[in-house]
Every structure is written in C-alpha cells, then in structure tokens.
Regions:
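Membrane-proximal interfacial segments on either side of biological membranes
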Residues: 1-300
Length: 300
C-alpha cells in the first residue's frame, strides 16, 4: 500500500518480458512440498501506455524474506505530497531498495535511495508495521527541489528513541497543513510512539514566499499526538516567532503563538484580512478533540 501511494499504482499495471532464475528445494515430491529459496529476475512494468524496468532478487530464509530491487523509472510520475515533491513524466530516475519482512508481517526498509537529476531522497532502516504505520527509522536525508521550486536540504537522524532534525533549507508548508488536519485515522506513526524531535534548521518556509530563520527547539509526541513544543525562530526582519505547546495535569493541550511581526502568519492562515502590523498572541486549549481559542491582536 505504501508503494502504491508513492508510485500511484492502479489495477491497470501489467508485468511482461520477465526473465526468472528460481532456486527451490523439495522435502517430499509425493506431498508436493516445495519451498522457494531464491528468485532472481527482471521485468518491464507497463501501465496506461507507460513502460519502466525493474530488476529484483528475493531470498527466503528461516523466518525472513529479503528483497533487493532496482527500478528504473522514466515514464511514470512520482508524487510525495507530505514533502511537496514531484517527479514529472519522462524524467530519468531510479529507486534502489533493500527490505526484509518477518513472520509478524512487519517490514524493515533497510535502505531506499531515490535519484532523479539533482534530487535525492535516502531512507535507512525504516520499520513499517502490518497496518502501514511507521514504527521507527534510523535516518532520512532529503535533497531536492520541490513543486514550489524551493530547495530542500534536511536530515532526520535517530538518537535512541528521539530524533535530531538538522538542515539548511526546508519547505514545511505541506507538513503544517497535514498537522492541522491530522486525526486518529491518518497518523503516520504507530499509536504508542512517544518521541521528541530536536530541531535546528537554518531556513524554514511556511509558504512559497514567507520563511523563518534559525528555527531551534524541540517538539514531543505522546501516543502519536503533539503534546509539547518549544520553538523559537526569527523572520528576515529580525522579529521573533515563538511556538509553545504544553500538556496540563488535566490532559489539556495548551498552544501559544507569539510574534511582533504577524503579517506572514496572517497571510498564511488568513486570521484577519488586511492586518499586517502589531502583536499577535494566539492561545488555544484542547481537550477531548474540543478546542477553545483566543486570538489577541494589539498595537495595529
């Protein structure tokens, strides 16, 4: 399902011109007990008039299946909405991957390397549960130009149960949109994950035109929901932007946003048309999926 969403695969996919080298063993011919040991091959993938090539090697061990594949993609587009990435049609690209699957049906993506022109996405030790949710990962590297023609250079690296997020440039607009819409049905991570992301990014776009500089701090998740945050950054004119999230003893999530330069925030979220200057102080208290918010606008 995960690869179907990335590659936009549908029921019209056909596999042809396949060459296979199969190794197997039989413990009893009378019982027709045949065990696949390995499979090596290459095929062409054909869908809606588009043709691409895949080479693969599959091995079946005691309690584990391992797959190594190289996919050459030219015709087919690739879209990753969460990070605003798109590979257009008729652009040479490749995906190299190695994954293992165990008897519990969880999948470990040992390595994925995607390359297309000057774009590269790298994932290491990404573990996916049988429900298609992410359990954890070791490293993610993003180096690409997105659909908004903005450069992205970001590294997310595991540190025990937490993650360190560093980079020079990143367009966070789609992740912000996703966070505002997130619910229990579309969570990326497994429900019992408790993680802290320590952030240090030089330049973060909140939309195509507006950005903040030197974003530092941390955000924390409890049971896959944001429950703590302490982030500070600066707009290009030097004005500070602060975001704080805390969980009270009554299980209330209190969110506070403060800045003396509200124009980019107002443009991004359309709080009040025409409001450009002054002080923006936003506070929200959420409990049991019910939010009560107060927006204070002063000195404008």
């Amino acid at each position: 399902k995960l690869f179907n969403e990335i590659l936009n695969v549908n029921n019209n996919l056909e596999i042809f011109d396949t060459n296979l080298d199969i190794t197997y063993e039989t413990s009893s011919l009378k019982q027709n007990n045949i065990k696949l040991l390995s499979l090596n091959g290459n095929s062409y993938l054909f869908e809606n008039g588009q043709k691409d090539k895949i080479q693969y090697q599959l091995t079946n061990q005691e309690n584990k299946v391992e797959l190594i594949a190289n996919i050459n993609i030219y015709s087919k587009p690739i879209l990753l909405n969460l990070i605003n990435f798109e590979k257009k049609e008729n652009v040479n690209s490749s995906i190299k991957l190695k994954l293992t699957s165990n008897k519990n049906r969880s999948i470990l993506l040992n390595k994925i390397i995607f390359k297309s022109k000057n774009d590269e996405i790298y994932l290491e030790d990404l573990r996916i549960k049988s429900n298609n949710q992410i359990e954890n990962f070791k490293k993610i590297e993003l180096n690409f130009t997105d659909k908004s023609n903005l450069q992205n250079n970001l590294v997310v690296k595991a540190q025990k149960k937490n993650y360190l997020v560093t980079g020079s440039k990143f367009n966070a607009s789609k992740i912000i949109d996703h966070s505002l819409k997130i619910n229990s049905k579309n969570n990326l991570f497994v429900s019992d994950n408790n993680n802290i992301f320590k952030i240090n990014i030089e330049k973060v776009y909140i939309d195509k035109k507006n950005y903040i500089k030197n974003l530092k701090g941390d955000i924390g998740f409890k049971n896959n929901k944001l429950n703590t945050a302490n982030l500070i950054s600066f707009f290009p004119n030097g004005e500070k932007f602060e975001l704080n999230v805390n969980e009270t003893q009554n299980n209330e999530i209190v969110t506070q946003i403060f800045t003396r330069y509200p124009k980019p925030i107002v443009q991004r979220y359309k709080f009040i048309d025409g409001f450009d200057e002054g002080v923006l102080n936003f506070q929200s208290v959420k409990k049991d999926n019910i939010s009560n918010s107060v927006l204070i606008i002063d000195n404008f």
